[in-house]
UniProtKB/Swiss-Prot annotation:
Gene Ontology molecular function: any one: beta-N-acetylhexosaminidase activity
Subcellular location: Lysosome; Cytoplasmic vesicle, Secretory vesicle, Cortical granule
Protein name stated in the entry: Beta-hexosaminidase subunit beta
Lineage: Eukaryota, Metazoa, Chordata, Craniata, Vertebrata
Record-listed E.C. numbers: 3.2.1.52
Disulfide-linked positions: C70-C116, C288-C339, C513-C530
Organism: Mus musculus
Length: 536
């Protein structure tokens, strides 16, 4: 039958469309995806694979030591499918065409003990490898913790164009963190943070491969932790009875963090920063004197009476059972000695002990007893640097957190030279805000830039970005943290050689938009826009 003249243009149009599709299949690939933090080894290949939201799946490899019974991975598979495709599957019909080559599946293989039911620890293995090739990508990890990090990397490799088409480069990635301790400090005493805000922070931490939530849960201002052993601590020490973290709240935070490979380390700072404790626990704090007259003012914890240590023995026994991590942060910073000096009972105790007028020896006496309590509970301790500076007799393995910005490199040298593990937070106090792109200052920090042997540098187990809460609550915590903390995240994860600021800016700008698309209200780096700003 002769071809109708009216059908010829339609045929030409179809041929043109086929040609365009063919061109698309051989178009130059994106060889620089915005991976954050940047992996240890990345090989990107020019070949693009197309991904269909309707056909793609994330599954367990048949030879994996984890399987469908591993709820941690099952939940992660669902979560990362949604991160990659968003609401595409619910709001779009079938794909307009099936382009080839295509990636059909991501198989996840755990090669050693899966640790599906465990909580992460300082020694958790976060190593993974990722091979993306047609038709199946393979993610291998020794444990679920590495698999979680690899899933995040995979999700960052997938690109959606303006037509809604999903693609990924064939690639090979081998990755592991530079430091095992990569933390974010939140402060829930100066301002109470609702549980949903903490959970949102844990999500953002996972997007940036942080693995420690340092929960500075109580301080002078309020005591929101609801103790089952000493309920009056929060009944009288919290801002209000609705500004507390119940046992169920704490369990929710712990499990939410576990599912994202994040440890939760609680901090109960003593003997200073304890005004809220005294409201619910009589005779715990030191009465201050004006000459020989007792005032209504109280100072640090009273270190001279046995009831103090009996209380803390019981209290920390509860804490050690509630929080599964091997570490408890004991604080020990900024202890004011004036009240101790004014109290005649303290003066008499120091005289009997032969301490003279050196209140650092009294502080050391107290801290040593608290460290012994923690050790008796089969836990390890973290302390702020003043505890080390004031010559407290520390137990082997006590971790010292270096937070004072002056001469922190020298402090790291001293701490590690004495054989103690160290955490660096001094250059990463994110509550100190300034105009402009201050993330660059955080990014340029080199944690191991101090004089010391290789053995000393191996004692630096990582660092933390700290966001103290004097001027931060649920309304501004997220944009103040992100993406500024992302700079710290890359410094603690990526190899030492990853330092190119221009490249980092390009990747971080995309990563910031990616966080916005996932519901994280991360503030902008500079001028520009995101395609997903309506998601916030």
């Amino acid at each position: 039958m002769p071809q109708s003249p009216r059908s010829a243009p339609g045929l030409l149009l179809l041929q043109a469309l086929v040609s365009l599709v063919s061109l698309a299949l051989v178009a130059p690939a994106r060889l620089q995806p915005a991976l954050w933090p940047f992996p240890r080894s990345v090989q990107m290949f020019p070949r693009l694979l197309y991904i269909s939201a309707e056909d793609f799946s994330i599954d367990h490899s048949p030879n994996s030591t984890a399987g469908p019974s591993c709820s941690l991975l099952q939940e992660a598979f669902r979560r990362y499918y949604n991160y990659v495709f968003g609401f595409y599957k619910r709001h779009h019909g079938p794909a307009r065409f099936r382009a080839e080559p295509q990636l059909q599946k991501l198989l996840v293989s755990i090669t050693l003990e899966s640790e599906c039911e465990s909580f992460p620890s300082l020694s958790s293995d976060e190593t993974y490898s990722l091979l993306v090739q047609e038709p199946v990508a393979v993610l291998k990890a020794n444990s679920v913790w590495g698999a979680l990090r690899g899933l995040e990397t995979f999700s960052q490799l997938v690109y959606q164009d303006s037509f809604g088409t999903f693609t990924i480069n064939e690639s090979s990635i081998a990755d592991s963190p530079r430091f095992p301790h990569r933390g974010i400090l939140i402060d829930t005493s100066r301002h109470f943070l609702p549980v949903k805000t903490i959970l949102k922070t844990l999500d953002a931490m996972a997007f940036n491969k942080f693995n420690v939530l340092h929960w500075h849960i109580v301080d002078d201002q309020s005591f929101p932790y609801q103790s089952t052993t000493f309920p009056e601590l929060s009944n009288k020490g919290s801002y209000s009875l609705s500004h507390v973290y119940t046992p169920n709240d704490v369990r929710m935070v712990l499990e939410y963090a576990r599912l994202r490979g994040i440890r939760v380390i609680p901090e109960f700072d003593t003997p200073g920063h304890t005004q809220s404790w005294g409201k619910g626990q009589k005779n715990l704090l030191t009465p201050c004197y004006n000459q020989k007259t007792k005032t209504q003012v109280f100072g640090p914890v009273d270190p001279t009476v046995n009831t103090t240590y009996a209380f803390f023995n019981t209290f920390f026994k509860e804490i050690s059972s509630v929080f599964p991590d091997q570490f408890i942060h004991l604080g020990g910073d900024e202890v004011e000695f004036q009240c101790w000096a004014s109290n005649p009972n303290i003066q008499g105790f120091m005289k009997r002990k032969g301490f003279g007028s050196d209140f650092r020896r009294l502080e050391s006496f107290y801290i040593k007893k608290i460290l012994e309590i923690i050790s008796s509970l089969k836990k390890n301790s973290i302390v702020w640097q003043e505890v080390f500076d004031d010559k407290v007799e520390l137990q082997p393995g006590t971790v010292v957190e270096v937070w004072k910005s002056e001469h922190y490199s020298y402090e790291l040298k001293q701490v590690t030279g004495s054989g103690f593990p160290a955490i660096l937070s001094a250059p990463w106090y994110l509550d100190l805000i300034s105009y402009g792109q201050d993330w660059k200052n955080y990014y340029k920090v080199e944690p191991l830039n101090f004089e010391g042997s290789e053995k000393q540098k191996q004692l630096v187990i990582g660092g933390e970005a700290c966001l103290w809460g004097e001027f931060v609550d649920a309304t501004n915590l997220t944009p103040r943290l992100w993406p500024r903390a992302s700079a710290v995240g890359e410094r603690l994860w990526s190899p030492k050689t990853v330092t190119d600021l221009e490249n980092a800016y390009k990747r971080l700008a995309v990563h910031r938009c990616r966080m916005v698309s996932r519901g994280i209200a991360a503030q902008p780096l500079y001028t520009g826009y995101c395609n997903y700003e309506n998601k916030i």
